[in-house]
Amino acid sequence: QRILIFAHLSHMYQDGASIYVTFLFPRAPDPEDTLLFWRRLKERASQTIVEAGGTISHQHGVGLDHAPYLEAEKGHLGIDVLNAVCKTLDPKGILNPGKLLTTTGSTYQEP
């Protein structure tokens, strides 16, 4: 299957730049198959970025799509700090419970 990949650089810094990537590919007859294909592309691209020492979030935050890579980017200490902040500011755990961080400190994983 042919995939067109477009990219542009944005937000240039001394130590790097933001690369925005768009994938174009034929949609499958079943929308679920199209979504699955896109998720696989995104997963492979995200893994490649993290393995190369890049970040996958930039100024837009993390969100559920990037949550599986949060610990790889922030490290165990970063996750511990985020959990401590959440527990301090939201001791009852009522703000988006179980979405990005859990009480065990691991990041969200899709079911």
Sequence positions of predicted segments:
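Conserved glycine-rich FAD pyrophosphate-binding loop
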Residues: 1-111
